[in-house]
């Protein structure tokens, strides 16, 4: 009986630990990230970026694949950002992609600004759309994928 009580207590404590873990609200997190990027671009007198459903969908798919493969690369399975976007929408003719891993939401924009190629993507003047996704892996690591794009014609 004592063993059963100990096992039950252990199980209950683990269940309590699970319930105190906070799920990531990706939509809310992306609102925060989009807001930070918009604020940065506004301070620099750059054009406003419109949130694009296709770019968000592609970013989400890619973040999940990066998480499953435990890697960060712009060319997983030999695909480019443009190829991934064209799977859903052929009208895009320009894209940029920035990735981050292991950085908290409140530090990711500054981390990108400290990298010349990421900064160039953040403050680009040749795109007008944005879409991104934040993934929390089972190892509790954040993966961010943000795509910038421009269509050659209205979709």
UniProtKB/Swiss-Prot annotation:
Residues 37-140 form the SCP domain. It comes from the Bacteria. Pfam families: CAP (PF00188). PANTHER family: SCP DOMAIN-CONTAINING PROTEIN. This is Uncharacterized protein BB_0689. It comes from Borreliella burgdorferi (strain ATCC 35210 / DSM 4680 / CIP 102532 / B31). The lineage of its organism: Bacteria, Pseudomonadati, Spirochaetota, Spirochaetia, Spirochaetales.
